[in-house]
Amino acid sequence: MSGKLTHIDQTGAANMVDVGSKDETERQAVAEGAVRMKPETLALILEGNAAKGDVIGTARLAGIMAAKRTSDLIPLCHPLMLTKVAVEIEPDENLPGLRVRALARLKGRTGVEMEALTAASVTCLTIYDMAKAVDRHMEIGSIRVIEKSGRKSGDWAVSDPASMR
């Protein structure tokens, strides 16, 4: 890592990084997050009895849609031609709550970690929105990139992707 911010020019102004001279490579990133909630809220969601409908299905779709709109939300992100976005939502009774994992993939000149992070974040936000009427104490957290591949500098992954900070 160079230790230099890439989105700031020599005058301190924000700028979009020029990736035009980079080679296209297969790139992938995976991000995770979690929504902690009361055990009763988790049960309600898993039973499909939430007042707003299918929480898991709706949240998955929201995450996929969000990944495709990342450059509209994050000012200096490049618009990307994603080839795959997948969102997994798994119950964790020990949390208690739902764990989210989002994957973004493309063949291109820049990474897709912001798209994976956006997918994971919006998935968690949608879960919160759909269940807030029954549990106002839900907590969204541990949103982070857990793996990245296709970079010139090599692949990267956290040592324990199941850990929660």
UniProtKB/Swiss-Prot annotation:
- SUPFAM superfamilies linked: Molybdenum cofactor biosynthesis protein C, MoaC
A Pfam family it matches: MoaC
Q: Which InterPro entries match?
A: MoaC, MoaC_bact/euk, MoaC_sf, MoCo_biosynth_MoaA/MoaC, Mopterin_CF_biosynth-C_dom
The protein's annotated catalytic reaction(s) are: (8S)-3',8-cyclo-7,8-dihydroguanosine 5'-triphosphate = cyclic pyranopterin phosphate + diphosphate
Positions with a binding annotation for substrate: 76-78, 114-115
Source species: Brucella canis (strain ATCC 23365 / NCTC 10854 / RM-666)
The keyword DNA repair is annotated on this UniProt entry: no
Q: Transmembrane as a keyword?
A: no
Q: Which superkingdom is the protein from?
A: Bacteria
Which biological processes are named by the entry's GO terms?
Mo-molybdopterin cofactor biosynthetic process
Keywords, A to Z, come to:
Lyase, Molybdenum cofactor biosynthesis
Q: What is its EC number?
A: 4.6.1.17
- Which family would the database say this protein is a member of? Belongs to the MoaC family.
Molecular function GO terms recorded = cyclic pyranopterin monophosphate synthase activity
The entry's protein name is: Cyclic pyranopterin monophosphate synthase
